[in-house]
A protein has these predicted regions:
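C-terminal alpha-helical interaction appendages
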Residues: 1-108
Length: 108
């Protein structure tokens, strides 16, 4: 998945933080557009950047299960599929066009 703008990157990173950690992008170094641009140029995906933020700030990952919210295993980082789901929730389908994992999932 190739991000072209810091706006796209920050939208996805913010959604991952909100959905999986009940946290906000504001107050983290990922809120800085220069940091977002550096991630884009280095090929770092939002889920990878959010994993680093979660480790740095000691954020517990949350999961939604049958009985509501619960803590996820601390050694279970976000993966690409979590990012694909975030893009779908945000309606950023243009980012998903060339992602083999999404194309396979969408055609199933």
């Amino acid at each position: 998945m190739q991000f072209q703008t810091t706006e796209q990157f920050s939208q996805v990173a913010a959604e991952l933080l909100r959905h999986h950690y009940l946290a906000q992008l504001a107050g983290t170094y990922l809120a800085n557009p220069d940091a977002q641009l550096a991630c884009i140029h280095q090929g770092i995906q939002p889920f990878e950047a959010v994993n680093a933020v979660a480790r740095e700030y000691g954020l517990p990952r949350m999961e939604i299960g049958l009985f509501g919210l619960s803590l996820a295993s601390p050694d279970r980082p976000l993966i690409e599929d979590d990012q694909l789901n975030a893009c779908e929730r945000l309606g950023l389908f243009e980012l998903l066009q060339d992602v083999p994992l999404y194309v396979e999932r969408a055609s199933a």
